[in-house]
């Protein structure tokens, strides 16, 4: 009887497993295929060089290089979010195809250890590997690899100097692409060995068109004014704008995305709060000013964010003379430096707002 029960249990378990496996098989055949969630920044990253927006000169040169399969060492520099990394990744995919892309490309960014030891070992070992000149699909493939050093301006001078010799020795089998925001932080011997390309800041129109296209594909309810506001607070960084758009969409849960939602997502200080600071400064009351600053800190707003937004508000203020603007701007620079050095936020903001109050009351 016990054996019989065991047998029944086993057979029942087998039947249960079989039954459970049936819908999984049906799902794997394509009827109910589950799509993996992907960040929109990666989902809408350019897949080929021609999809790169607003960088016509760079695209034209790369297109000629891809046609001849003759790629020089590259140096991409420009503001963040303008497509530097996306451009070289798209070019590498076109050169090597999806099957060889992982084998032929080594990508290192600021999150990786990139001291002199890494340049001497990891980069050098990868560069010394020999590769064939053909792909599995029969298409021609250049006989070299690509090393992408993202945020190269954060590398030490010693690591950059070590990289110089590696670039020379492995020129037959490896091409290097250095990506940075500030080209002045790259040593001259490296820049002289690379073809330099400056990535221009994306215009507001280009960014708005791209965001509207993504919003349409993702069925996001958002108006043109909200898109324009999103572009403004992103400060020319399209990557940041796309991330804010996705976060705002998830927060609203399918409802229309408003400016207030975008403000909360982006960590921007509301315009009403900035106006409240100016109102307190105009009043000439130090007690009112202290209450406003204390409330600002209690709400969790970043002091550096306030400095940036106050700077824009001061520059656009038509009631202030150029002399008063210059005094306040100089104070903004001092406060920004002190905050970067770890000074107390409350004291620095009080000092800044006191200067603004002094200039506003003198101007009246």
UniProtKB/Swiss-Prot annotation:
Disulfide bonds: none
Pfam families: AAA, RCF1-5-like_lid, Rep_fac_C
Modified residues (N-acetylmethionine): 1
Residues reported to bind ATP: 78-85
Gene Ontology CC entries for this record: Ctf18 RFC-like complex; DNA replication factor C complex; Elg1 RFC-like complex; nucleoplasm
GO biological process: DNA-templated DNA replication; positive regulation of DNA-directed DNA polymerase activity
Keywords attached to this entry: Acetylation, ATP-binding, DNA replication, Nucleotide-binding, Nucleus
InterPro entries the UniProt entry points to: AAA+_ATPase, ATPase_AAA_core, DNA_pol3_clamp-load_cplx_C, DNA_Rep/Repair_Clamp_Loader, P-loop_NTPase, Rep_factorC_C, RFC_lid
GO molecular function, one term: ATP hydrolysis activity
SUPFAM superfamilies: P-loop containing nucleoside triphosphate hydrolases, post-AAA+ oligomerization domain-like
Positions carrying N6-acetyllysine: 6, 13
Location(s), subcellular: Nucleus
Binding partners and assembly: Subunit of the RFC complex, an heteropentameric complex consisting of a large subunit RFC1 and four small subunits RFC2, RFC3, RFC4 and RFC5; the RFC complex interacts with PCNA. Forms an heterotetrameric complex with RFC2, RFC3 and RFC5; this complex has ATPase activity but is not stimulated by PCNA. The heterotetramer of subunits RFC2, RFC3, RFC4 and RFC5 interacts with RAD17. Interacts with ATAD5. Interacts with CTF18. Interacts with CNTD1; this interaction facilitates crossover formation.
Function: Subunit of the replication factor C (RFC) complex which acts during elongation of primed DNA templates by DNA polymerases delta and epsilon, and is necessary for ATP-dependent loading of proliferating cell nuclear antigen (PCNA) onto primed DNA. The RFC4 subunit probably functions as a scaffold on which the other complex components can assemble.
Homology family: Belongs to the activator 1 small subunits family.
Note: Despite of the presence of a putative ATP-binding motif, this protein does not bind ATP.
Protein name: Replication factor C subunit 4
Gene transcribed to yield this protein: Rfc4
